């Protein structure tokens, strides 16, 4: 039930915010030790310091990739999750008749991870990645290449003038490569020899 999941994630987010506020208040108060007293160890954090994550089982219900990515984007934005993990459903013998009898292709899980990366690090929105017709990612093309082929009007890109956001949408250019291109552009115009 999506509503129940969202309510529990919201409650978790509020608890994390409260714990962080409480920690800030405690850190602001001066610590006074009695003469001869040994300092105590700090209490373990209530929530994981690295952030919260969740997992989605892909293929256990009729949810398409667009729905899964929209849910992931909402979890990242509204609940500030650090990571969403995807696992392909694996059927088990004598399971409920409501569950599928066949597992989805493992490549679907891989494509969802690629799309998730585009959401988190490349500035893509969930509705840009998954196609509107059917809502399923292509198993033949990675999501960034599929997006580029669906938007030929955005290409070619001038590497000497394009902003970071536009360069991140070029297939084959990752975050580090774009950062290096931008640094090289400060020194001089880019040449073909610079790109090899």
Which ranges hold each PLM region?
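Helix-hairpin-helix
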Residues: 157-184, 188-191, 195-196
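Conserved AdoMet/S-adenosylmethionine-binding subsite of the radical SAM
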Residues: 1-124
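Short linear functional motifs in flexible/disordered or boundary regions
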Residues: 24, 66, 127, 179, ...
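Long, highly charged, low-complexity intrinsically disordered interaction regions
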Residues: 97-169
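A short alpha-helix capping/helix-coil boundary motif
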Residues: 49-52, 143-144, 171-172
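A short, structure-level motif marking secondary-structure boundaries and short turns
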Residues: 56-58, 148-150, 162, 176-177
């Amino acid at each position: 039930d999506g509503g129940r999941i969202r309510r529990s994630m919201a409650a978790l987010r509020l608890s994390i915010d409260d714990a962080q506020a409480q920690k800030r208040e405690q850190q602001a108060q001066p610590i006074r030790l009695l003469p001869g007293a040994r300092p105590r160890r700090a209490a373990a954090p209530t929530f994981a310091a690295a952030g919260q994550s969740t997992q989605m089982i892909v293929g256990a219900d009729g949810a398409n990739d667009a729905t899964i990515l929209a849910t992931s984007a909402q979890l990242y934005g509204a609940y500030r999750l650090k990571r969403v993990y995807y696992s392909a459903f694996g059927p088990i013998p004598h399971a409920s008749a409501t569950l599928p009898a066949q597992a989805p292709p493992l490549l679907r899980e891989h494509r969802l991870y690629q799309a998730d990366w585009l959401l988190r690090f490349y500035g893509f929105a969930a509705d840009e990645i998954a196609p509107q017709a059917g809502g399923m990612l292509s198993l033949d093309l990675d999501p960034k290449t599929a997006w580029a082929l669906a938007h030929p009007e955005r290409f070619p890109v001038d590497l000497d003038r394009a902003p970071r956001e536009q360069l991140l949408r070029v297939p084959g250019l990752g975050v580090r490569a774009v950062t290096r291109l931008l640094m090289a552009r400060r020194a001089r115009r880019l040449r073909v020899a610079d790109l090899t």
